[in-house]
UniProtKB/Swiss-Prot annotation:
<keyword id="KW-0030">Aminoacyl-tRNA synthetase</keyword>
<feature type="short sequence motif" description="'HIGH' region">
    <location>
        <begin position="9"/>
        <end position="19"/>
    </location>
</feature>
<dbReference type="GO" id="GO:0000049">
    <property type="term" value="F:tRNA binding"/>
</dbReference>
<keyword id="KW-0547">Nucleotide-binding</keyword>
<dbReference type="InterPro" id="IPR014729">
    <property type="entry name" value="Rossmann-like_a/b/a_fold"/>
</dbReference>
<dbReference type="InterPro" id="IPR033910">
    <property type="entry name" value="GluRS_core"/>
</dbReference>
<dbReference type="InterPro" id="IPR004527">
    <property type="entry name" value="Glu-tRNA-ligase_bac/mito"/>
</dbReference>
<dbReference type="InterPro" id="IPR000924">
    <property type="entry name" value="Glu/Gln-tRNA-synth"/>
</dbReference>
<dbReference type="InterPro" id="IPR049940">
    <property type="entry name" value="GluQ/Sye"/>
</dbReference>
<dbReference type="InterPro" id="IPR020751">
    <property type="entry name" value="aa-tRNA-synth_I_codon-bd_sub2"/>
</dbReference>
<comment type="similarity">
    <text>Belongs to the class-I aminoacyl-tRNA synthetase family. Glutamate--tRNA ligase type 1 subfamily.</text>
</comment>
<feature type="binding site">
    <location>
        <position position="255"/>
    </location>
    <ligand>
        <name>ATP</name>
    </ligand>
</feature>
<dbReference type="GO" id="GO:0008270">
    <property type="term" value="F:zinc ion binding"/>
</dbReference>
<keyword id="KW-0963">Cytoplasm</keyword>
<dbReference type="GO" id="GO:0005524">
    <property type="term" value="F:ATP binding"/>
</dbReference>
<dbReference type="InterPro" id="IPR001412">
    <property type="entry name" value="aa-tRNA-synth_I_CS"/>
</dbReference>
<comment type="subunit">
    <text>Monomer.</text>
</comment>
Amino acid sequence: MKIRTRYAPSPTGYLHIGGARTALFNYLLAKAYGGDFIIRIEDTDIERNVEGGINSQLDFLAWMGIIPDESIRNPKAFGPYIQSEKLKHYEKLALDLVDQKKAYFCFCSKEQLDADRELAEKSHQTPKYKRHCLNLDKKTIESNLLQNKEYTIRLKINENMEYSWDDLIRGKISIPGSALTDPVILKSNKIAMYNFAVVIDDYEMQISHVIRGEEHISNTPYQLAIAQALNYDITKIKYGHLSIIVDETGKKLSKRNLSLKQFVSDYEKDGYWPHAITNFVALLGWSPKNNDEIMSLETMIKNFDINNLSKSPAFFDINKMNWFSTQYFNNITQEEFINFIKKHSLTKELVLNDYTFINKCLLFKSHIINLKQLIDLVIEQFNCDKKVLASDVDYIKKNQLITVVRVFYEQLIINDEFNEEFIKEIIKKVQIITNNKGANLYMPIRIATTFSSHGPELAKTICYLGREKVLKNLINILKILD
Protein backbone atom coordinates (compact mmCIF):
# COMPACT_ATOMS: atom_id res chain seq x y z
CA MET A 1 0.00 0.00 0.00
CA LYS A 2 1.33 3.44 -0.94
CA ILE A 3 1.86 5.84 1.95
CA ARG A 4 -0.36 8.90 1.56
CA THR A 5 -0.36 11.56 4.28
CA ARG A 6 -2.09 14.90 4.52
CA TYR A 7 -2.07 18.24 6.26
CA ALA A 8 -5.50 19.84 6.37
CA PRO A 9 -5.43 23.42 7.65
CA SER A 10 -8.35 25.80 8.01
CA PRO A 11 -7.79 29.16 6.28
CA THR A 12 -8.52 31.03 9.50
CA GLY A 13 -5.14 32.70 9.93
CA TYR A 14 -1.40 32.39 9.55
CA LEU A 15 0.60 29.15 9.74
CA HIS A 16 1.26 28.39 13.42
CA ILE A 17 4.40 26.59 14.61
CA GLY A 18 2.20 23.68 15.74
CA GLY A 19 0.59 23.42 12.31
CA ALA A 20 4.00 23.68 10.64
CA ARG A 21 5.24 20.74 12.74
CA THR A 22 2.18 18.65 11.83
CA ALA A 23 2.68 19.40 8.14
CA LEU A 24 6.41 18.66 8.32
CA PHE A 25 6.03 15.29 10.07
CA ASN A 26 3.37 14.17 7.59
CA TYR A 27 5.62 15.32 4.74
CA LEU A 28 8.66 13.49 6.14
CA LEU A 29 6.70 10.28 6.73
CA ALA A 30 5.38 10.26 3.16
CA LYS A 31 8.74 11.06 1.60
CA ALA A 32 10.63 8.55 3.79
CA TYR A 33 8.60 5.76 2.18
CA GLY A 34 8.32 7.15 -1.34
CA GLY A 35 4.73 8.22 -0.76
CA ASP A 36 2.61 11.30 -1.43
CA PHE A 37 1.95 14.30 0.79
CA ILE A 38 -1.35 16.11 0.26
CA ILE A 39 -2.58 19.49 1.44
CA ARG A 40 -6.32 19.97 1.50
CA ILE A 41 -8.17 22.97 2.82
CA GLU A 42 -10.86 22.57 5.47
CA ASP A 43 -12.79 25.78 4.97
CA THR A 44 -16.27 24.82 6.19
CA ASP A 45 -16.05 27.11 9.24
CA ILE A 46 -17.01 30.01 6.99
CA GLU A 47 -17.34 32.66 9.72
CA ARG A 48 -13.71 32.20 10.80
CA ASN A 49 -12.12 32.03 7.35
CA VAL A 50 -9.90 35.00 6.49
CA GLU A 51 -9.17 36.45 3.08
CA GLY A 52 -5.88 35.13 1.76
CA GLY A 53 -5.79 32.39 4.40
CA ILE A 54 -5.38 29.57 1.88
CA ASN A 55 -2.47 31.19 0.03
CA SER A 56 -0.87 32.14 3.34
CA GLN A 57 -0.82 28.51 4.50
CA LEU A 58 0.58 27.21 1.22
CA ASP A 59 3.11 30.03 0.81
CA PHE A 60 4.65 29.69 4.27
CA LEU A 61 4.83 25.90 4.00
CA ALA A 62 6.64 26.37 0.68
CA TRP A 63 8.96 28.90 2.39
CA MET A 64 9.89 26.09 4.80
CA GLY A 65 10.52 23.73 1.88
CA ILE A 66 7.32 21.72 2.36
CA ILE A 67 5.87 21.27 -1.12
CA PRO A 68 2.81 19.00 -1.48
CA ASP A 69 2.42 16.41 -4.21
CA GLU A 70 -1.25 17.37 -4.43
CA SER A 71 -3.12 20.53 -3.46
CA ILE A 72 -5.43 23.15 -4.95
CA ARG A 73 -2.34 24.47 -6.76
CA ASN A 74 -1.40 21.11 -8.25
CA PRO A 75 -4.60 19.04 -8.28
CA LYS A 76 -4.62 15.40 -9.32
CA ALA A 77 -7.19 12.61 -9.37
CA PHE A 78 -8.21 12.87 -5.71
CA GLY A 79 -9.70 16.39 -5.72
CA PRO A 80 -11.39 18.66 -4.96
CA TYR A 81 -8.79 19.71 -2.40
CA ILE A 82 -11.02 22.25 -0.70
CA GLN A 83 -14.04 21.19 1.34
CA SER A 84 -16.37 24.01 0.29
CA GLU A 85 -16.43 22.46 -3.20
CA LYS A 86 -17.83 19.19 -1.78
CA LEU A 87 -20.74 20.42 0.35
CA LYS A 88 -23.46 18.70 -1.72
CA HIS A 89 -21.49 15.46 -1.63
CA TYR A 90 -21.24 15.54 2.17
CA GLU A 91 -24.95 16.37 2.46
CA LYS A 92 -25.93 13.42 0.25
CA LEU A 93 -23.85 11.00 2.33
CA ALA A 94 -25.39 12.33 5.55
CA LEU A 95 -28.91 11.85 4.14
CA ASP A 96 -27.95 8.34 2.99
CA LEU A 97 -27.05 7.50 6.60
CA VAL A 98 -30.48 8.76 7.69
CA ASP A 99 -32.11 6.45 5.13
CA GLN A 100 -30.02 3.58 6.52
CA LYS A 101 -31.13 4.38 10.11
CA LYS A 102 -27.50 5.05 11.07
CA ALA A 103 -28.20 8.75 11.55
CA TYR A 104 -31.29 10.83 12.29
CA PHE A 105 -32.80 14.29 11.97
CA CYS A 106 -32.52 16.40 15.11
CA PHE A 107 -35.03 19.25 15.45
CA CYS A 108 -33.99 20.32 18.95
CA SER A 109 -33.76 24.05 19.50
CA LYS A 110 -30.63 25.77 20.75
CA GLU A 111 -32.52 26.66 23.93
CA GLN A 112 -33.31 23.02 24.66
CA LEU A 113 -29.75 21.89 24.01
CA ASP A 114 -28.39 24.70 26.22
CA ALA A 115 -30.78 23.72 29.02
CA ASP A 116 -29.67 20.06 28.80
CA ARG A 117 -26.01 21.12 28.90
CA GLU A 118 -26.59 23.36 31.92
CA LEU A 119 -28.36 20.56 33.79
CA ALA A 120 -25.52 18.12 33.10
CA GLU A 121 -22.91 20.60 34.27
CA LYS A 122 -24.84 21.28 37.49
CA SER A 123 -24.88 17.53 38.12
CA HIS A 124 -21.12 17.35 37.38
CA GLN A 125 -21.77 15.11 34.38
CA THR A 126 -20.25 15.29 30.91
CA PRO A 127 -22.86 16.94 28.65
CA LYS A 128 -24.38 14.44 26.21
CA TYR A 129 -27.23 14.76 23.77
CA LYS A 130 -30.37 13.26 25.36
CA ARG A 131 -31.52 11.67 22.10
CA HIS A 132 -34.84 13.54 22.12
CA CYS A 133 -35.13 13.05 18.35
CA LEU A 134 -33.71 9.54 17.99
CA ASN A 135 -37.04 7.75 17.84
CA LEU A 136 -39.28 10.33 16.20
CA ASP A 137 -41.93 8.65 14.07
CA LYS A 138 -42.02 9.09 10.32
CA LYS A 139 -45.11 11.30 10.44
CA THR A 140 -43.52 13.80 12.86
CA ILE A 141 -40.33 13.95 10.81
CA GLU A 142 -42.23 14.54 7.54
CA SER A 143 -44.38 17.22 9.18
CA ASN A 144 -41.32 19.03 10.53
CA LEU A 145 -39.63 18.89 7.13
CA LEU A 146 -42.77 20.20 5.36
CA GLN A 147 -42.83 23.12 7.79
CA ASN A 148 -39.17 23.81 6.95
CA LYS A 149 -38.31 23.32 10.58
CA GLU A 150 -34.58 23.75 11.12
CA TYR A 151 -32.69 20.52 11.70
CA THR A 152 -29.27 19.00 12.05
CA ILE A 153 -28.31 15.41 11.31
CA ARG A 154 -26.79 13.33 14.09
CA LEU A 155 -24.94 10.04 13.90
CA LYS A 156 -26.32 7.28 16.11
CA ILE A 157 -23.43 6.06 18.28
CA ASN A 158 -23.34 2.39 19.24
CA GLU A 159 -23.03 2.71 23.02
CA ASN A 160 -22.09 -0.95 23.40
CA MET A 161 -19.08 -0.66 21.14
CA GLU A 162 -15.46 0.01 22.05
CA TYR A 163 -13.75 2.44 19.69
CA SER A 164 -10.04 1.66 19.70
CA TRP A 165 -6.95 2.12 17.57
CA ASP A 166 -3.22 1.41 17.79
CA ASP A 167 -1.84 4.92 17.96
CA LEU A 168 1.47 5.24 16.10
CA ILE A 169 2.92 7.34 18.93
CA ARG A 170 0.95 6.42 22.06
CA GLY A 171 0.10 2.75 21.62
CA LYS A 172 -3.41 1.34 22.02
CA ILE A 173 -6.14 3.83 22.89
CA SER A 174 -9.66 2.66 23.59
CA ILE A 175 -12.79 4.71 24.30
CA PRO A 176 -16.19 3.15 25.07
CA GLY A 177 -19.18 4.21 23.01
CA SER A 178 -21.01 4.97 26.25
CA ALA A 179 -18.59 7.88 26.80
CA LEU A 180 -19.59 9.48 23.49
CA THR A 181 -22.56 11.56 22.44
CA ASP A 182 -24.47 11.37 19.17
CA PRO A 183 -22.45 13.91 17.15
CA VAL A 184 -23.91 16.36 14.68
CA ILE A 185 -22.56 15.44 11.23
CA LEU A 186 -24.52 18.01 9.22
CA LYS A 187 -25.31 21.48 10.54
CA SER A 188 -28.60 23.29 10.01
CA ASN A 189 -27.01 25.34 7.20
CA LYS A 190 -26.33 22.05 5.34
CA ILE A 191 -22.57 22.33 5.92
CA ALA A 192 -20.82 19.17 7.08
CA MET A 193 -19.26 19.10 10.53
CA TYR A 194 -15.49 18.77 10.76
CA ASN A 195 -15.42 15.11 11.84
CA PHE A 196 -17.80 14.02 9.09
CA ALA A 197 -16.03 15.81 6.23
CA VAL A 198 -12.59 14.67 7.45
CA VAL A 199 -13.55 11.00 7.40
CA ILE A 200 -14.99 11.24 3.89
CA ASP A 201 -11.99 13.17 2.57
CA ASP A 202 -9.43 10.84 4.14
CA TYR A 203 -11.21 7.81 2.67
CA GLU A 204 -11.74 9.26 -0.80
CA MET A 205 -8.18 10.61 -0.98
CA GLN A 206 -6.85 7.19 0.10
CA ILE A 207 -4.98 8.64 3.07
CA SER A 208 -3.02 5.89 4.82
CA HIS A 209 -1.51 7.73 7.80
CA VAL A 210 -2.67 10.73 9.81
CA ILE A 211 -0.23 12.46 12.17
CA ARG A 212 -1.84 15.27 14.14
CA GLY A 213 -1.90 17.04 17.51
CA GLU A 214 -3.05 15.31 20.67
CA GLU A 215 -6.11 17.59 20.80
CA HIS A 216 -7.53 15.34 18.07
CA ILE A 217 -7.49 12.21 20.26
CA SER A 218 -11.05 13.02 21.35
CA ASN A 219 -12.11 13.31 17.68
CA THR A 220 -10.75 9.90 16.71
CA PRO A 221 -13.50 7.67 18.21
CA TYR A 222 -16.13 9.80 16.48
CA GLN A 223 -14.25 9.51 13.20
CA LEU A 224 -14.04 5.74 13.62
CA ALA A 225 -17.79 5.60 14.30
CA ILE A 226 -18.53 7.72 11.22
CA ALA A 227 -16.22 5.58 9.06
CA GLN A 228 -17.99 2.41 10.23
CA ALA A 229 -21.38 3.92 9.47
CA LEU A 230 -20.18 4.76 5.95
CA ASN A 231 -18.90 1.17 5.57
CA TYR A 232 -15.29 2.29 5.25
CA ASP A 233 -12.51 -0.07 6.27
CA ILE A 234 -11.31 1.59 9.49
CA THR A 235 -8.12 -0.48 9.55
CA LYS A 236 -6.78 1.27 6.44
CA ILE A 237 -5.85 4.51 8.22
CA LYS A 238 -3.20 4.66 10.94
CA TYR A 239 -3.42 7.52 13.43
CA GLY A 240 -0.62 9.10 15.44
CA HIS A 241 -1.13 11.92 17.94
CA LEU A 242 1.75 14.30 18.64
CA SER A 243 2.67 15.69 22.03
CA ILE A 244 1.81 19.27 22.90
CA ILE A 245 4.37 22.06 22.48
CA VAL A 246 5.04 24.03 25.67
CA ASP A 247 6.54 27.47 26.31
CA GLU A 248 9.28 28.43 28.78
CA THR A 249 6.80 28.19 31.69
CA GLY A 250 5.80 24.63 30.78
CA LYS A 251 2.35 25.74 29.62
CA LYS A 252 0.88 24.63 26.32
CA LEU A 253 1.79 27.00 23.51
CA SER A 254 -1.10 29.43 23.24
CA LYS A 255 -1.79 31.87 20.43
CA ARG A 256 -2.85 34.30 23.14
CA ASN A 257 0.73 34.45 24.46
CA LEU A 258 1.76 37.51 22.47
CA SER A 259 5.21 37.67 24.07
CA LEU A 260 6.29 34.65 22.01
CA LYS A 261 6.36 34.68 18.24
CA GLN A 262 4.45 31.55 17.22
CA PHE A 263 3.66 32.07 13.56
CA VAL A 264 6.00 31.13 10.73
CA SER A 265 5.24 34.51 9.13
CA ASP A 266 6.89 36.26 12.12
CA TYR A 267 10.17 34.50 11.40
CA GLU A 268 9.98 35.07 7.66
CA LYS A 269 9.27 38.76 8.29
CA ASP A 270 12.27 39.09 10.63
CA GLY A 271 14.55 37.48 8.04
CA TYR A 272 15.40 34.11 9.56
CA TRP A 273 17.04 31.60 7.25
CA PRO A 274 14.05 29.45 6.13
CA HIS A 275 15.54 25.99 6.66
CA ALA A 276 16.70 26.97 10.16
CA ILE A 277 13.02 27.19 11.12
CA THR A 278 12.26 23.88 9.39
CA ASN A 279 15.19 22.22 11.18
CA PHE A 280 14.12 23.61 14.56
CA VAL A 281 10.49 22.57 14.07
CA ALA A 282 11.56 19.04 13.06
CA LEU A 283 13.09 18.50 16.50
CA LEU A 284 9.95 19.52 18.41
CA GLY A 285 9.14 15.99 19.53
CA TRP A 286 11.39 14.01 17.19
CA SER A 287 14.75 12.60 18.27
CA PRO A 288 16.73 11.12 15.36
CA LYS A 289 18.61 7.95 16.31
CA ASN A 290 22.00 9.45 15.46
CA ASN A 291 21.24 12.59 17.53
CA ASP A 292 21.93 14.86 14.56
CA GLU A 293 20.79 18.45 15.01
CA ILE A 294 21.76 20.24 11.80
CA MET A 295 19.96 18.41 8.99
CA SER A 296 19.03 19.16 5.41
CA LEU A 297 15.53 18.24 4.31
CA GLU A 298 17.00 15.25 2.47
CA THR A 299 18.72 14.07 5.66
CA MET A 300 15.50 14.48 7.63
CA ILE A 301 13.65 12.33 5.09
CA LYS A 302 16.37 9.68 5.23
CA ASN A 303 16.43 9.61 9.06
CA PHE A 304 12.73 10.04 9.81
CA ASP A 305 11.21 7.24 11.86
CA ILE A 306 7.80 7.62 13.43
CA ASN A 307 8.93 5.34 16.27
CA ASN A 308 11.26 8.13 17.41
CA LEU A 309 8.43 10.62 17.99
CA SER A 310 7.99 11.41 21.67
CA LYS A 311 4.85 11.37 23.82
CA SER A 312 6.41 13.95 26.15
CA PRO A 313 5.76 17.67 25.65
CA ALA A 314 8.12 19.43 23.24
CA PHE A 315 9.79 22.60 24.55
CA PHE A 316 9.65 25.64 22.30
CA ASP A 317 13.04 27.19 23.02
CA ILE A 318 13.47 30.47 21.14
CA ASN A 319 17.17 30.52 22.03
CA LYS A 320 17.58 27.17 20.30
CA MET A 321 15.76 28.46 17.25
CA ASN A 322 18.08 31.47 17.15
CA TRP A 323 21.07 29.14 17.46
CA PHE A 324 19.89 27.17 14.44
CA SER A 325 19.51 30.33 12.39
CA THR A 326 23.02 31.53 13.30
CA GLN A 327 24.46 28.12 12.35
CA TYR A 328 22.82 28.29 8.94
CA PHE A 329 23.89 31.87 8.23
CA ASN A 330 27.42 30.87 9.20
CA ASN A 331 27.43 27.83 6.89
CA ILE A 332 25.64 29.04 3.76
CA THR A 333 27.74 30.29 0.86
CA GLN A 334 28.43 33.97 0.32
CA GLU A 335 26.37 33.80 -2.87
CA GLU A 336 23.36 32.33 -1.04
CA PHE A 337 23.66 35.02 1.62
CA ILE A 338 23.83 37.85 -0.92
CA ASN A 339 20.83 36.50 -2.86
CA PHE A 340 18.84 36.27 0.37
CA ILE A 341 19.64 39.91 1.23
CA LYS A 342 18.80 41.10 -2.28
CA LYS A 343 15.38 39.43 -2.29
CA HIS A 344 14.13 39.91 1.27
CA SER A 345 11.64 42.72 1.88
CA LEU A 346 13.68 44.04 4.83
CA THR A 347 16.89 44.54 2.89
CA LYS A 348 16.24 44.78 -0.85
CA GLU A 349 15.71 48.58 -0.75
CA LEU A 350 18.84 49.04 1.36
CA VAL A 351 20.84 47.12 -1.24
CA LEU A 352 19.62 49.49 -3.95
CA ASN A 353 20.25 52.65 -1.90
CA ASP A 354 23.77 51.85 -0.64
CA TYR A 355 26.29 50.17 -2.94
CA THR A 356 28.40 49.16 0.09
CA PHE A 357 25.47 47.64 2.01
CA ILE A 358 26.10 44.04 0.90
CA ASN A 359 29.78 44.27 1.83
CA LYS A 360 28.84 45.69 5.22
CA CYS A 361 26.38 42.81 5.73
CA LEU A 362 29.04 40.24 4.86
CA LEU A 363 31.06 41.42 7.86
CA PHE A 364 28.34 40.04 10.16
CA LYS A 365 27.36 36.91 8.18
CA SER A 366 28.68 34.39 10.69
CA HIS A 367 27.18 36.05 13.77
CA ILE A 368 23.60 37.01 12.97
CA ILE A 369 20.28 35.47 13.93
CA ASN A 370 18.18 37.20 11.28
CA LEU A 371 18.15 40.13 8.87
CA LYS A 372 16.36 42.39 11.33
CA GLN A 373 19.32 42.01 13.69
CA LEU A 374 21.73 42.39 10.77
CA ILE A 375 20.28 45.79 9.85
CA ASP A 376 20.62 46.94 13.47
CA LEU A 377 24.26 45.80 13.53
CA VAL A 378 25.09 47.59 10.27
CA ILE A 379 23.39 50.78 11.44
CA GLU A 380 25.12 50.63 14.82
CA GLN A 381 28.55 49.98 13.29
CA PHE A 382 28.35 52.51 10.48
CA ASN A 383 26.26 55.21 12.15
CA CYS A 384 27.74 58.57 11.11
CA ASP A 385 26.54 60.32 14.28
CA LYS A 386 28.04 57.85 16.73
CA LYS A 387 29.86 59.35 19.74
CA VAL A 388 32.91 57.74 21.31
CA LEU A 389 32.30 56.41 24.82
CA ALA A 390 34.20 57.94 27.73
CA SER A 391 35.08 54.42 28.92
CA ASP A 392 36.75 53.68 25.56
CA VAL A 393 38.77 56.91 25.74
CA ASP A 394 39.82 55.96 29.29
CA TYR A 395 40.95 52.55 28.02
CA ILE A 396 43.37 54.19 25.57
CA LYS A 397 44.66 56.62 28.20
CA LYS A 398 45.11 54.05 30.98
CA ASN A 399 46.98 51.67 28.73
CA GLN A 400 49.14 54.48 27.29
CA LEU A 401 48.09 53.69 23.74
CA ILE A 402 47.70 57.25 22.40
CA THR A 403 50.82 56.74 20.27
CA VAL A 404 49.10 53.89 18.39
CA VAL A 405 46.23 56.20 17.45
CA ARG A 406 48.52 59.07 16.48
CA VAL A 407 50.80 56.92 14.30
CA PHE A 408 47.80 55.33 12.55
CA TYR A 409 46.44 58.81 11.79
CA GLU A 410 49.83 60.04 10.51
CA GLN A 411 50.22 57.04 8.19
CA LEU A 412 46.70 57.51 6.85
CA ILE A 413 46.87 61.27 6.25
CA ILE A 414 49.99 61.13 4.08
CA ASN A 415 48.39 58.70 1.62
CA ASP A 416 45.42 59.19 -0.70
CA GLU A 417 45.04 55.43 -1.13
CA PHE A 418 42.21 53.88 0.86
CA ASN A 419 41.26 50.23 0.54
CA GLU A 420 41.31 47.08 2.64
CA GLU A 421 44.85 45.98 1.72
CA PHE A 422 46.23 49.47 2.26
CA ILE A 423 44.63 49.63 5.73
CA LYS A 424 46.16 46.27 6.63
CA GLU A 425 49.57 47.59 5.58
CA ILE A 426 49.15 50.69 7.75
CA ILE A 427 48.25 48.52 10.76
CA LYS A 428 51.45 46.49 10.19
CA LYS A 429 53.49 49.72 10.06
CA VAL A 430 51.90 50.93 13.30
CA GLN A 431 52.81 47.60 14.90
CA ILE A 432 56.49 48.00 13.88
CA ILE A 433 56.74 51.69 14.84
CA THR A 434 55.00 51.42 18.24
CA ASN A 435 56.06 47.86 19.08
CA ASN A 436 52.48 46.98 20.08
CA LYS A 437 50.54 43.89 19.07
CA GLY A 438 47.30 42.04 19.86
CA ALA A 439 44.72 44.01 21.84
CA ASN A 440 47.20 46.85 22.45
CA LEU A 441 47.40 47.34 18.70
CA TYR A 442 43.92 46.58 17.42
CA MET A 443 41.74 47.94 20.25
CA PRO A 444 42.94 51.59 20.14
CA ILE A 445 42.76 51.60 16.32
CA ARG A 446 39.22 50.17 16.42
CA ILE A 447 38.04 52.66 19.06
CA ALA A 448 39.64 55.63 17.30
CA THR A 449 38.39 54.81 13.80
CA THR A 450 34.95 53.28 14.46
CA PHE A 451 34.09 54.78 17.89
CA SER A 452 33.35 51.24 19.05
CA SER A 453 35.35 48.74 21.12
CA HIS A 454 33.97 45.72 19.30
CA GLY A 455 32.88 44.81 15.82
CA PRO A 456 33.63 42.70 12.76
CA GLU A 457 36.88 42.45 10.79
CA LEU A 458 38.74 45.71 11.44
CA ALA A 459 40.32 46.52 8.06
CA LYS A 460 37.04 45.90 6.21
CA THR A 461 35.07 47.95 8.74
CA ILE A 462 37.46 50.91 8.39
CA CYS A 463 37.30 50.58 4.61
CA TYR A 464 33.47 50.66 4.48
CA LEU A 465 33.31 53.62 6.87
CA GLY A 466 35.18 55.60 4.24
CA ARG A 467 38.33 57.73 4.41
CA GLU A 468 36.55 60.98 5.23
CA LYS A 469 34.61 59.53 8.17
CA VAL A 470 37.65 57.67 9.55
CA LEU A 471 39.86 60.78 9.43
CA LYS A 472 37.13 62.82 11.11
CA ASN A 473 36.86 60.24 13.92
CA LEU A 474 40.65 60.14 14.37
CA ILE A 475 40.92 63.95 14.57
CA ASN A 476 38.08 64.14 17.11
CA ILE A 477 39.47 61.44 19.38
CA LEU A 478 43.02 62.86 19.24
CA LYS A 479 41.62 66.20 20.42
CA ILE A 480 40.01 64.41 23.37
CA LEU A 481 43.15 62.39 24.13
CA ASP A 482 45.42 65.43 23.94
